Amino acid sequence: KSADGKITLNVINYHVGTDYAADYYEYLFDAFKKTEEGKNVEFKFEEIPTTDAYNQKIKLLISSGDLPDIVLNGGNNITALAAKSGKVTDITEYLDKDPEWKAMFSDQDLEFNSYEGKVYGIPVSKEISYIYYNKDLFKKAGLEAPDVAYETWDDFYKACDTLKSKNITPVSMDTADLGWLSNLWYSGLIGTAGEEGNKFMNTMYPTDYTSDLVVNATEQLQKMLKNYTTADALGGKYDTMATHFFNGEVAMLPNGPWMIPDFKSTDKAPEGFYDKVGIMLLPGSGMESVPTPGDMVGAKDPEKIKAAVAFLKFETTAENQLKALEMAGLQPVSSNNEVPESLKESDPLMAEVLDIQSKAKYTYGQNQAYWYQNVIDTFSTQLPELAYGNMTAKEFCQKLTDAAKKN
């Protein structure tokens, strides 16, 4: 504390400039100072304008140096690394003392942010994805989209065949840069394949991809790459594929809520595109849902630790979770949020995203969150070979397994 009783918290902030959440974090730091717990708190900021530079800096400070009092998450899962260094606070007792706060998070969220049974990170959002579809293209093909999802993958393929018969490319897929879109289709194919498939897609670092179930999903992914996507998907990157969707050249694309602001942006999509977009879950009512790395406390002084924990608590109030959704497209970490009337008017698509989550029968992870890096790389580099028919689904799965076993 300084002489005037103020507590100064050091923060390295990458939510600055044109960052998607810059306005939200500016609001959050200001609003906290107006609360009972934050009225004596001042923030001292060091600004780093990119996530990559920020993540490198934090990793450096974990190995040698002092961490900021509040360690914002940069999307990288560094919980174990930080916990092992002894430089971050164990938040478990604070959560246990406040059951209402603890109830905001699922066991999965807290487990993801724990090391050796102790919680070190407080997640502020979760990553989810589903399917966006173009209402105009569905109408043109004489198709009525399901309210929630196609009941089966076969129903989904029938719709793809109908779209194709009207010269409409059914889905966006990619293979370069880790093949994000193809990974979301693949994760859905496995994650909705009954209890066994769902368990597999919720497992961290699997090492065996040779089960009939995964081979079958791979055969279906191969079919989609061969029959239902754009010619440039092989070797193609996400940005190009997203542009196809914006331009009305593709009927469906899997992705998360962070894409919604792009539908309104005339830099990316044509005027009025937002109104043409609908949402559905993956066939079988599947939805990717992955816990995110949380914010941590790097403060040493007991007064500062107390103030930093109070900030994390403020950051995750129901009100601020919805504010983060409205201002930054961050998906609330709690799944029982009321959909505010104001959101239904200002951003009906985002309101629909909040609403449809409770209708998922299967939730599962995706490979970039749960698989070894070299397996993700192998997935991306071997996809074109699979698509061209240069290898069978079985051989593809063996390559993933060989890569995983090297870890």
Where are these regions (language model features)?
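Hinge/lid segment of periplasmic solute-binding proteins
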Residues: 74-130, 157, 184-187, 274-278, ...
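Short amphipathic alpha-helical coupling segments at ligand-binding clamshell hinges
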Residues: 24, 216-220, 303-315, 323, ...
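Extracytoplasmic/periplasmic solute-binding protein
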Residues: 115-124, 129, 139, 154-206, ...
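Conserved N-terminal structural module of periplasmic/extracytoplasmic solute-binding proteins
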Residues: 1-80, 84-85, 96-100, 145, ...
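Short helix-initiation/N-cap motifs at beta->coil->alpha
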Residues: 47-57, 74-76, 150-157, 232-246
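Glycine-centered hinge/linker elements that transmit conformational signals in sensory
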Residues: 158-162, 202-235
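Extracytoplasmic/periplasmic substrate-recognition and gating elements
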Residues: 7, 34, 39-42, 141-144, ...
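Long, aromatic- and glycine/proline-rich binding clefts that accommodate carbohydrate-like moieties
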Residues: 108, 275-280, 325-378, 384-385
